[in-house]
């Protein structure tokens, strides 16, 4: 089932006012983002159906009138419920399965944010008389430092990418040789441009322009941005595109990066590929073996090289510079180290 069909199925089983909300506010967002909101709101409706409106038989039977009856206390209880709850679904083989679900503070906040967005929409469009979610505080999040790849880790990764013949054997070597140039092009594009994994897999052949040494990506929200390529990125993409011309069984002629099945690579397939190489390089930190680690490494390298944070924000596709400052400026350890090393602790004291 395609993602578009998956989204349609979700919306079909939700009330009309949620369909309208997603259609109006999130049409420009990626399908994955829209599906995420649908899942969050479905969990909220399932909670209301179980504890607040037991007479509602199907989720699609909920109305704006029901939302107008929701109290702040209901949202507070839903917030507590999200810490640990049971969900029941029908498996592909027709069996009824019950699972215990748990959410971190981040997961709880994300779901509350989805509910807040819905109630804000209903209030602004005069479909409810009060937005009770304004009274609810989000969980306080403690920021955790997720480090970029070190220079040594980056070099080990690149060594395996370019010289995998020394590291892989048997069928793993066969697989490596078959996708070597594609994988190199993906890694170097990440490290050299900092694009998001979704932006990378959505690239088409026609998005690449070697005359201008750039390519076009569709950022979050649907805006297009021209990304200029470092020489290494341009060279590896050119080699891959030349090799791609000789590949057999391509089913998606537009897609830049092709899977072994001849289809456009998915976010999941790129994640698995990156994890495979990180494992081979001895990188066991799960936060460093995800695509975002390469994006983080790109941003941190720019900051350590003294690139202005406004330029870094633009290159990262951040509309708000505060996002760049919050999530990446903290990693500029070189500058912090220099400041601390030059502090005269004792002054003139002998």
Segment roles from a protein language model:
Residues 1-350:
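Conserved catalytic core of the tyrosine transesterase superfamily
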């Amino acid at each position: 089932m395609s993602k578009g069909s998956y989204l349609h199925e979700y919306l079909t089983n939700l009330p009309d006012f949620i369909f309208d909300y997603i259609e109006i506010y999130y049409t420009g967002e990626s399908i994955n983002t829209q599906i995420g909101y649908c899942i969050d709101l479905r969990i909220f409706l399932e909670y209301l159906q179980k504890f607040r409106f037991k007479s509602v038989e199907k989720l699609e039977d909920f109305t704006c009138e029901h939302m107008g009856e929701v109290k702040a206390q209901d949202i507070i209880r839903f917030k507590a419920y999200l810490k640990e709850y049971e969900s029941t679904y029908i498996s592909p083989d027709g069996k009824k399965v019950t699972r215990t679900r748990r959410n971190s503070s981040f997961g709880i906040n994300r779901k509350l944010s989805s509910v807040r967005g819905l109630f804000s929409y209903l209030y602004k469009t005069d479909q409810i008389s009060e937005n009770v979610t304004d009274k609810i505080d989000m969980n306080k999040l403690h920021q955790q430092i997720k480090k970029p790849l070190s220079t040594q880790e980056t070099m080990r990764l690149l060594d395996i990418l370019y010289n995998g013949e020394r590291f892989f054997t048997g069928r793993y070597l066969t697989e490596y040789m078959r996708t070597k140039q594609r994988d190199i092009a993906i890694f170097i594009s990440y490290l050299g441009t900092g694009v998001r994994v979704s932006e990378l897999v959505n690239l088409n052949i026609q998005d690449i322009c070697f005359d201008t040494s750039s390519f076009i990506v569709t950022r979050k929200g649907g805006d297009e941005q021209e990304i200029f390529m470092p020489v290494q990125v341009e060279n590896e993409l050119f080699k891959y595109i030349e090799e791609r011309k000789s590949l057999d069984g391509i089913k998606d002629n537009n897609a830049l990066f092709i899977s072994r099945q001849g289809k456009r690579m998915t976010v999941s397939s790129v994640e698995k590929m990156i994890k495979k190489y990180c494992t081979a390089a001895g990188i066991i930190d799960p936060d460093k073996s995800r695509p975002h680690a390469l994006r983080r490494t790109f941003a941190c390298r720019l900051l350590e090289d003294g690139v202005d944070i406004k330029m870094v924000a633009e290159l990262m596709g951040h509309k708000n510079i505060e996002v760049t400052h919050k999530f990446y400026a903290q990693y500029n350890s070189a500058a912090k180290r220099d400041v601390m090393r030059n502090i005269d602790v004792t002054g003139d004291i002998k």
